[in-house]
Every structure is written in C-alpha cells, then in structure tokens.
C-alpha cells in the first residue's frame, strides 16, 4: 500500500524476543536519518501517546505471540497506521482481514534464525513510509560480500572466544549505538548456549555498573564490541575501563567491526556473536535449537 499521510509523527515498533530485537537493530542502523521519535515496545500494552498519526510496525514470527497480539488491539483502537511482519498465525489473519501492509517471513526453525529478514524488512518499511532513503539496499549487498570474505576468520575467532567464555559468566559491552548488537549477543548465548550473563552500554554503565566492578571476579569474561562509529568520548571511556576490568579478570576480549557502513559493522558483529554462541553450545554439549523451557511457559500460560 502507499504511505498513509497520517503516519508522520511517531514510529512505534512492537515485538518480543527474536522477533523484537530486529526492531532495535533496524532503528539504530537508520538513527542518523530518522526525524521522528522511534519507540521499541516489548510488552502487552502501548504508550498512551499513540494515535492516528503513529506508524506501528508489529512483528511476530509465529504470528501468535500473546503480548504482541494484545498490544496490537491498542494500536487498532487508536486507529494507528499498522504494518505487520510475520510468518503466519493470527497476526497474518488480522493483517489480511484489515488490509494492513503485510510482509511474510519464510519458514524457519526459530525467530532468532530470521534476524536478517526482520531487519531488512523493517528497513524496507522505513523507506516505504518515507522516513529513510534506500541506501540500505547497496549497503546490504556490500555487507553480504564482506561477510562472505570474512566468514572463515570470523568462525576461527568465534571458536577461540567460545573456549575463553567456557565456564565463565559473560559480560558484554558496547557503545550505545551498538546496543542492539550486544542484546542480540546476550540473547544468543542465553538461548543457544543455555548460559547466563548480562549486557550494558557506554557511557551509561560508567554512572552505575562501573562501581559494581569493585566486586569483579576472575569468573567473569568481558566481551567488548567496538565500532568506528562510536562517539569519540565514549571510545576514550571504553579504553580507560578496559584497564579497570583487567584488574578483576584476565578475560577481557575486544572485537573491532569491519565494514564501510554502520549496517555492515552491525552485521559483522552479529555474525561473530552468533557463531560464538553456537561453539559455546558445543562446548557445553547442549542443543542450540532447543528452547523447551519457553514452550513449557507458553503451555502453562495457555491453561490460565
């Protein structure tokens, strides 16, 4: 459908888990172009400010995510401009019934395996609604070529990193513009490797979490994802804090992204992080696909 003239004030993105992180990453890729507020929503509810001038992109791989479908009702009641990204399920049915813009994801084992589709489709929607240009098209092609060239080195680095993370609690950091990358990395370690850890960003962590490093231990492994797009002062902060971390743990790893665009550097880190999680799963001898505890939770919720 053509762009609605109503969708001009706020961009609102609804989704959770593997279907939700794509919104965060896509928004950060085009942050330098967006001239409207962009809000990522991961809940049952929607902010009170949404109205007929709000574009709401609703994403759920299965199309049956409970929280997303509940939030969609709020957007419908507000008469917002709605676009949907899904493989099927109830979300696809609702989109077709209401003639919403609908992008269909191909079948896959899990939502987290569809991240690239999710990000690119959202960039397409940003462009379709007139919020960004189409530079992402050529940047995506260049990124594919880059990753094809670098994949063997990325895999080698991932194997070494997985060994360094084994039997440790991981802590991952980046500058705020790369927050989507480290949240994705944390999620992949959680789901694929069945391990716990946390993620935080510079400069915010300097105002709270840094003090917590007084209780840092050797059992912590720090992974820092760097980008040439960092704010210069954040880069200085990271360099100083590396030395602070090293006073408490010998495992402080730093990765510099390759690529000529923010999009390329983003996916370089995502690919590296994904491979780390897979090889860590191998070391832990766990199934990197299995998420039975999530299925159990959904089954229990369905009883209530």
Predicted features along the sequence, with ranges:
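Single conserved hydrophobic/aromatic residue that forms the stacking wall/gate
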Residues: 1-7, 11
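Active-site phosphate/pyrophosphate-binding segments
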Residues: 6-8, 127-221, 299-304
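Short, glycine-/Ser/Thr-/acidic-enriched flexible segments
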Residues: 18, 177-178, 204, 227-230, ...
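Predominant activation on well-ordered alpha-helical scaffold segments within soluble catalytic domains
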Residues: 27-28, 69, 119-126, 183-190, ...
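Short, small/acidic-rich helices and loops at N termini and domain boundaries
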Residues: 287-304
